[in-house]
C-alpha cells in the first residue's frame, strides 16, 4: 500500500494480455519492461499456472526494483503446473477452451478492481479468441494488438481468410497432403514472393486433425481488422517489403525488434540476463560451453511446445553424434509425445563424448556464447530473431504455427539457414550439421548471419528504426490514454 500511496493516477497504465505460451509471455514481458522504463504503469496478466511457473523459475526476481509494474492472474482451470504425461499442444488447447468461455468475465472483473485505472490494453494478436477486443470495447479502453511473430508470420496468418475465399483451403481430404498439392505457388501474397502452400502455417490446410486451429486462425485474421494500432516483433531492415505492405493495410504499425537488444540498452547491466522463462534454467549448460573452442558447438533446442517421436529423437541423436561436432541439446521433460525422453543406452553412451544434454537454458546467453557456431531449431520466431541478433546460422525443423513461414524466409530470403526434412534421417542430419559447421555453405551463412546481427544492432541504436518506433509507441499510448 505504501507504493500505491505514491501512485500518479494521471499516468498511463497499460494492461498486457499475453497468449499463454512461453515464447509469447517472454516477448510481451520484455516489451512491458521497456514501456515501464519509459514511464508507464504496467499490469501484466498471466494465468495462475503460468505465473506460478514464472515465479518458480526466478522470472520475477527483478520486480522489487520496478515500482509501478504489477502482475495479476486469472484462473486457467488447471489444478497445478504439470508437464509430465500431457502433450503441450493438448494442454494448450484445453486452456484455450477454458479461456474462450471464461476470460471475458474474469478480465472485466480484474480490470475494474485495479487500484490505478487502466488506460490502454496491449493484447497478444493470438489472444483475440478469448473476447479480448470485445472486453476492451465494453470497458471503453483503447486496444493495441501485439504480434509476437515476424511480419512474414503475421502475413501468412492474415491470408487465411483470402485462401478460404479462393477455395484453396480447406483441403478436400488427407491425400492432398502428399499428392503435390502443397507445392502450389501462392504468388499473390503481398511481400512474399513465390511462397508455396506448404510454407504457410499447416493450420491453414484445415485437415480433420487441426480444424480447431484453422477456425482459430480464421477468426484471428478477421479480428485483426478491428484494431487501428499494431505492434510486430521484427525490425524493418529484415522484412522491409513485408512491413511496407502491412503498413499499407493497417494505419499504425510499430516494428520493435529485437526486443532483447532494446532491453539491453535501457535496463541495468546486472539485470540484462533476467529470466523470462517458465522453466528453471540450468547454469551447467553455459559452464560446459566455457570449456569449448569458438564456433565449435551446435546448439539444439526445439522450443517449448514442439513434440517428437522417440524415433525422431534417435535419428537426431545419431546424426549429431556422427557429425563429430560438439553439441548442446535441450531436451524438455515432455518432448517425446508429452512424456520424458527414454533414450536408448547405446545412443546415450555415444552422446556422452561430444554432447551435453540439459532440460532448459538461458537461450540468449547460449546463442551469444563464442563457442556456439550453429543452431538446430524448430523455427519459432523467438528463437530465430534471437539467433539473428547473435549472428548464428541455423538448421530448421519447423513443426507448428508460423514456423514453416519462418523457416522458408530464413533459408530463401535471409540466407542464414537450411531446412531438415520432416521425416528425420540421421544421414541428412549428419550431412547438414557438417555443412553448417565446416562447409563453405556454412561459412557463407555465418557471414550473412553476422550481417543481420549488425542490422539488428543498428535498428536498436538511438536513432534506429526499432528504437524510433518504440518511442512513437510510448507517445501514442500516452496520447490514447488522454482521450
UniProtKB/Swiss-Prot annotation:
UDP-alpha-D-glucose binds at residues 304, 360-361, 378-386, 400-403. This is UDP-glycosyltransferase 85C1. It comes from the Eukaryota. The gene is UGT85C1. Transmembrane segments: none annotated. May glycosylate diterpenes or flavonols in leaves. Belongs to the UDP-glycosyltransferase family. It holds the Pfam family UDPGT. It is an enzyme of class 2 (transferase). SUPFAM superfamilies: UDP-Glycosyltransferase/glycogen phosphorylase. Keywords: Glycosyltransferase, Transferase. Its EC number is 2.4.1.-. One of its GO terms (molecular function) is quercetin 7-O-glucosyltransferase activity. PROSITE patterns: UDPGT.
Amino acid at each position: 500500500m505504501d507504493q500505491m500511496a505514491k501512485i500518479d493516477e494521471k499516468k498511463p497504465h497499460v494492461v498486457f494480455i499475453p497468449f499463454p505460451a512461453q515464447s509469447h509471455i517472454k516477448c510481451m514481458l520484455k516489451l512491458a519492461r521497456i514501456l515501464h522504463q519509459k514511464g508507464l504503469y504496467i499490469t501484466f496478466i498471466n494465468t495462475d499456472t503460468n505465473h506460478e511457473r514464472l515465479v518458480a523459475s526466478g522470472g520475477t526476481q527483478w520486480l522489487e526494483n520496478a515500482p509501478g509494474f504489477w502482475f495479476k492472474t486469472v484462473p486457467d482451470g488447471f489444478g497445478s503446473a504439470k508437464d509430465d504425461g500431457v502433450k503441450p499442444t493438448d494442454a494448450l488447447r484445453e486452456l484455450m477452451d477454458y479461456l474462450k468461455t471464461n476470460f471475458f468475465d474474469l478480465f472485466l472483473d480484474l480490470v475494474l478492481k485495479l487500484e490505478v485505472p487502466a488506460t490502454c490494453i496491449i493484447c497478444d494478436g493470438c489472444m483475440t479468441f478469448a473476447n479480448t477486443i470485445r472486453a476492451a470495447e465494453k470497458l471503453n479502453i483503447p486496444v493495441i494488438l501485439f504480434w509476437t511473430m515476424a511480419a512474414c508470420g503475421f502475413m501468412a496468418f492474415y491470408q487465411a481468410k483470402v485462401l478460404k475465399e479462393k477455395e484453396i483451403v480447406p483441403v478436400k481430404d488427407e491425400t492432398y497432403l502428399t499428392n503435390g498439392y502443397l507445392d502450389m505457388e501462392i504468388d499473390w501474397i503481398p511481400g512474399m514472393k513465390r511462397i508455396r502452400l506448404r510454407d504457410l502455417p499447416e493450420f491453414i490446410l484445415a485437415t480433420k486433425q487441426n480444424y480447431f486451429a484453422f477456425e482459430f486462425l480464421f477468426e484471428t485474421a478477421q479480428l485483426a481488422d478491428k484494431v487501428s494500432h499494431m505492434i510486430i516483433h521484427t525490425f524493418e531492415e529484415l522484412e522491409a517489403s513485408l512491413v511496407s505492405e502491412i503498413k499499407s493495410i493497417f494505419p499504425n504499425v510499430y516494428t520493435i525488434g529485437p526486443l532483447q537488444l532494446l532491453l539491453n540498452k535501457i535496463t541495468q547491466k546486472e539485470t540484462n540476463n533476467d529470466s523470462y522463462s517458465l522453466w528453471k534454467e540450468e547454469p551447467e549448460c553455459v559452464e560446459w560451453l566455457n570449456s569449448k573452442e569458438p564456433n565449435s558447438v551446435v546448439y539444439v533446442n526445439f522450443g517449448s511446445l514442439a513434440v517428437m517421436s522417440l524415433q525422431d529423437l534417435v535419428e537426431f541423436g545419431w546424426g549429431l553424434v556422427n557429425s563429430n561436432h560438439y553439441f548442446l541439446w535441450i531436451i524438455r521433460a515432455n518432448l517425446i509425445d508429452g512424456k520424458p525422453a527414454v533414450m536408448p543406452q547405446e545412443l546415450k553412451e555415444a552422446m556422452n563424448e561430444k554432447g551435453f544434454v540439459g532440460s532448459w537454458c538461458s537461450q540468449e546467453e547460449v546463442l551469444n556464447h563464442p563457442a556456439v557456431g550453429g543452431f538446430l531449431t524448430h523455427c519459432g520466431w523467438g528463437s530465430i530473431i534471437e539467433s539473428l541478433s547473435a549472428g548464428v546460422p541455423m538448421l530448421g525443423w519447423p513443426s507448428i504455427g508460423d514456423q514453416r513461414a519462418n523457416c522458408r524466409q530464413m533459408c530463401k530470403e535471409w540466407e542464414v539457414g537450411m531446412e531438415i526434412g520432416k521425416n528425420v534421417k540421421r544421414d541428412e542430419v549428419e550431412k547438414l550439421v557438417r555443412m553448417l559447421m565446416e562447409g563453405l555453405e556454412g561459412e557463407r551463412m555465418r557471414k550473412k548471419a553476422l550481417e543481420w546481427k549488425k542490422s539488428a544492432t543498428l535498428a536498436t541504436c538511438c536513432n534506429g528504426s526499432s528504437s524510433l518506433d518504440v518511442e512513437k509507441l510510448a507517445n501514442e499510448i500516452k496520447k490514447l490514454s488522454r482521450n
